[in-house]
């Protein structure tokens, strides 16, 4: 809350403004967001032409997260007090001419204990993955397999949702930052290569990878492309479009240098094994239009409705492929 303290010394009026921001957790920084001094754009929004109303010039406003989304709701109204002092500075009386009005409360669905645990797990997981990647990169470099060397892991995200209500219980993005020192650290955070201020959980758009397989499975079952007993052989490679220069591999085939495959899997086994070839085959038989229909029904490419800023993402399809410098859409693109 902001309080204006007006002290009178002779004929001089001194105006002092104090700010207090207290956080009860060192976690959830991307969710809570932070405040900063007003920009010129903020001035136009929060200081109308009548300068006797609106925010003071030195007011800090929400810049991200809940602080930004609910700025108007959380802000409250300044209070003023007239303070009388002696010539030596001793306060003789304080008269509150206008009491401050606190802002409203915002209640989140976030379980803070779960949030803290998820952030710790995410940080530890990325650290361990990077150690393994460093070992692999060193090995590939020694063996001269420079095309196998991969970039450092820049970050990650975890979202935990109540499956019955859809409410988010934890939203973690790594790397993160310390809200209690955001002002002092802000310049360094802006220049950091791994972009700690960026909320990867809500604002990043990434390929879904194997998490898309249940969508393909449900579409295939519903459209009678497969049933629960249908078996598809994983030979390690999906070769139907090899003549077009596209023969994607199953992960197990790649990781074992072509030594292992999943053999015959039904849909349950394919999900358990995360068999790429099984789902390449199902997707190919479905076709992109039908696959798009089911993806949209699952909410992919659509806004979730969360109050915080989010990126909706996009599913490649024949209607938007020209945006990616692709001349035409072929069946192999559906598999991909």
What is the predicted role of each segment?
Residues 85-97, 110, 136, 142-143, ...:
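Beta-lactam-recognizing serine transpeptidase/beta-lactamase-like catalytic domain environment
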Residues 40, 79, 127, 131, ...:
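A generic secondary-structure boundary signal that marks alpha-helix termini
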Residues 2-5, 91-155:
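Conserved, well-ordered alpha-helix/loop/beta-strand core segments that scaffold catalytic motifs
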Residues 20-23, 115, 313-315:
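A short acidic, often aromatic-flanked loop/helix-cap motif at beta-alpha or helix-coil junctions
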Residues 41-56, 135-148, 336:
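Low-complexity, polar-biased intrinsically disordered regions enriched in Pro/Ser/Thr/Gly
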Residues 3, 7, 29-33, 64, ...:
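Solvent-exposed, polar/charged alpha-helical surfaces in well-ordered, non-transmembrane soluble domains
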Residues 1-103, 120, 127:
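Small/polar-residue-rich segments within soluble enzyme cores
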């Amino acid at each position: 809350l902001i309080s204006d303290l007006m002290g009178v010394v002779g004929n001089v009026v001194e105006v002092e403004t104090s700010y207090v921001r207290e956080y009860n957790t060192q976690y959830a920084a991307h969710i809570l967001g932070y405040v900063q001094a007003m920009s010129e754009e903020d001035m136009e929004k929060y200081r109308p032409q009548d300068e006797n109303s609106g925010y003071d010039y030195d007011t800090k406003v929400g810049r991200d997260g809940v602080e930004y989304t609910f700025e108007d709701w959380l802000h409250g109204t300044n209070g003023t007090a007239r303070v009388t002092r002696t010539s030596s500075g001793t306060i003789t009386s304080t008269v509150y001419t206008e009491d401050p009005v606190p802002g409203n409360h915002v209640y989140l669905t976030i379980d803070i204990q779960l949030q803290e645990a998820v952030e710790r797990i995410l940080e530890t997981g990325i650290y361990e993955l990077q150690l393994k990647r460093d070992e692999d990169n060193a090995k590939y470099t020694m063996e001269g397999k420079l095309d196998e060397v991969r970039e450092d892991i820049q970050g990650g995200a975890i979202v935990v949702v109540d499956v019955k209500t859809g409410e988010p219980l934890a939203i973690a993005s790594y790397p993160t930052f310390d809200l209690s020192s955001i002002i002092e650290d802000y310049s360094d955070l802006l220049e950091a290569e791994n972009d700690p201020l960026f909320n990867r959980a809500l604002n990043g758009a990434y390929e879904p990878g194997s998490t898309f397989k249940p969508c393909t499975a449900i579409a295939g079952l519903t459209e009678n492309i497969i049933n629960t007993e249908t078996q598809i052989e994983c030979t390690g490679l999906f070769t139907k479009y090899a003549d077009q220069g596209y023969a994607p591999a199953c992960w197990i085939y790649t990781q074992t240098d072509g030594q292992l495959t999943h053999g015959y899997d039904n849909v349950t086994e394919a999900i358990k094994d995360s068999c790429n070839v099984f789902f390449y085959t199902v997707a190919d038989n479905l076709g992109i239009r039908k696959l798009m229909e089911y993806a949209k029904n699952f909410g992919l490419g659509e806004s979730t409705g969360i109050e915080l800023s989010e990126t909706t993402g996009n599913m490649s399809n024949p209607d938007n492929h020209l945006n990616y410098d692709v001349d035409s859409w072929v069946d192999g693109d559906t598999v991909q």
